[in-house]
Structure formats: C-alpha cells, structure tokens
C-alpha cells in the first residue's frame, strides 16, 4: 500500500535547499501560482512554499493556500518526479476558491511530470 504521509524529509527546510532550486529551475505557472522544480538525487520529491505577505495580506488566507498546496503535494507525491519543488503564490491567489486552486496545482504537477519525462 502506498503511504500518503508528509514527513519532514519531503520538505525543503533550509535556505540552501531553496537556493538550489532557484539556481536552475524548470518552471510551470499560471497567473496565480508558479511551481519551480529542479531534479534531486534523493529518490523522492520535496516541496517548499512561499506565500508573500505582499501578495496575500491576511494570515488565514496564507495558511489556507499553504494547507491546500501541502495536501495537493501529499496526494501526488508518488506520481511526481524526484525533484525539489518551490511553490510561489502570486497576487490574486487569495481570490481563488479551494477547488480552483486545487485544480490549478494538479495541472502544474502534471506539467512538471511531462517536462521531466519520468512519469
């Protein structure tokens, strides 16, 4: 049976992890969300989230966006290539409802899958 947990090793935790992705990223984006990715050698994907206060003013909205993004990653982690991902929320993402945001994230995960040609 496939585990759908979200343990610590599936997260980008340090600034060095984020810098690694920002150096040579493959990107996929919508007007509201961008996902940068870079291949890693760990054998499993990892994710980091950036939701700027400048783009999403209210803390509960930032938390909602992060919660939905983590859940989307958790459900798709076994179908994703072994990459480090950084999810960047842009202006207007707080206006999306949960269903629309989840669909946008699923579309971007599929796009990264096609770009890496390992899915």
UniProtKB/Swiss-Prot annotation:
GO terms for molecular function: 3'-tRNA processing endoribonuclease activity; ribonuclease P activity; tRNA binding. Gene3D superfamilies: 3.30.230.10. Its EC number is 3.1.26.5. GO terms for biological process: tRNA 5'-leader removal. SUPFAM superfamilies: Ribosomal protein S5 domain 2-like (SSF54211). It catalyses: Endonucleolytic cleavage of RNA, removing 5'-extranucleotides from tRNA precursor. The keyword Nuclease applies. Keywords: Endonuclease, Hydrolase, Nuclease, RNA-binding, tRNA processing. One of its GO terms (cellular component) is ribonuclease P complex. RNaseP catalyzes the removal of the 5'-leader sequence from pre-tRNA to produce the mature 5'-terminus. It can also cleave other RNA substrates such as 4.5S RNA. The protein component plays an auxiliary but essential role in vivo by binding to the 5'-leader sequence and broadening the substrate specificity of the ribozyme. PANTHER family: RIBONUCLEASE P PROTEIN COMPONENT. Belongs to the RnpA family. Consists of a catalytic RNA component (M1 or rnpB) and a protein subunit. This is Ribonuclease P protein component. The gene is rnpA.
